[in-house]
Each structure stands twice: as structure tokens, then as C-alpha cells.
Amino acid sequence: MSTPDGHTTACHIEACLADLGTDRFAQTFVSFVETLGVDQIMVFAIEHAQARCLLSWHFSRSVMAGKLAETYLDGWFLKDPLLPDLVVSPPQSVTLSRLAEIEGRMSADYRKLFFENPGMLAKTTLLAVGERLRLFDSLYQSDPAAPLCDPDLARLAGRLALLHFEKASDTDLPPPLAALSERERSVCLGILSGRKAEAIAADLDVAPSTVITYRKRAYAKLGIASRAGLFAICGK
């Protein structure tokens, strides 16, 4: 991926600022993050020893994420080597951390599970703390030839995510689904409600095979591999 010019970057940032707190932000934001040359972004809110997924988006065609979000939410976030730093970070701060800085602080099991097995070679994490939220905004890269994402733009991405999620009102829509297309979102909501492909197809007036296509597209974008992964990132 080529590096965007200053004008293009400014346009992306302006669009993100305009959409803060709205249901349009997620799509605008992932368009900006894609220009950073990363394969995946995940945003988790850590609250009272619990983790909640606010955004999971996969840009690469390669299979990288799989069950990682599901596994991370199932207690492994408590072993994140950056968790102690996030807990003590002051309000209105965004701190950048690279994988090389924390490798010595993670257990062998954690390293194997989240980095070696999925082939993640680089991770840039923004520890973003506001008035009520403490976020891990993680940017993953798997291409050994790719440069690390720009630190200033990465910090800005962390700041934008924090501003948005602090401002956004609670809705019935699980936050990770906000960046999907309307049809992809509808299919995921149908799955979350326990409906089968035939019933979802009837609701949308499409063929069941079309529902399966939308489901596959949604799962690929969300960086998940199964229904269980969808339930995990949506907190169901």
C-alpha cells in the first residue's frame, strides 16, 4: 500500500472529526486506518476487569485474526502486558507502544497464541484514556517487508477513537457492526438473534445463498471465523 499524501490524510481526518459520535464514524474511521498500512485494527474498552470490543476490522485478504478476539475477550486480556500501564494512565492521554517494547513482559503462552501462531509480526497499541473510557486501540501488521505504521498518525487514530466512543450514545447496535454495510449488518443481527439463514433471507427478501454470501463478507471484514466469534465481539 502506498503512503497517502498530506491532502488525502487531511481529508480522512476531517471526515472522521465530522462524524464523531455518529453511526457514520466507524466506516469513515476504518477508511482512514486503512491508509496506515495495517492488516487489522481492534479497539477494546477495559472496564472493571472486563473487556468489551468496540471495533474489529480486517483489511488483509490473509487469514490472520481467526479466534483471536474471541480468545482475548475470554480472559486473556487480563494477561495483556500493557494492562497495568492502561490502568494507571492519566485521563486525556494517548500513549503509543510497539511490540518490541513489551515482548519481554509477555508470557510464552501469550506470545505464541496472539503473535507466533497467527503470524503477527508487528503491533502498535495506543493506550487511550478519556473521562470514562480506557481503550486499547491495536494496529496489527503481518507483512515482514512493510514499515511500521506512522507513530503520529497512529496516535491520532487512537485519539479519534477515544473521542468518538466517549461521545457516542448507547444504541441497540453492537459497536463492532457499525462499519459493515446495511445488508451485512442485518445478517449479523439476524444471526445474533438466533435466526437461521432461511428466516433471515425471508426478512431481507433475498435467497438463503445471498445471506451466506453477506455472512462470509461480514466475518472477513470483522476478522472472525465463526458464529462464536461474532457473539464474542458483540458481547452476546
Language-model features: where?
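Short helix-to-turn junction characteristic of helix-turn-helix DNA-binding domains
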Residues: 191-195, 234
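Pre-signature/interface helix of ABC/ABC-like ATPase nucleotide-binding domains
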Residues: 175-178, 189, 220, 232
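Amphipathic alpha-helical "output/dimerization" segments
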Residues: 145-163
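Alpha-helical hairpin
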Residues: 146-149, 180, 222
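Regulatory hinge/linker segments at domain boundaries
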Residues: 166-186
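Short alpha-helical "packing" element that flanks the helix-turn-helix/winged-helix DNA-binding module
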Residues: 184-191, 230
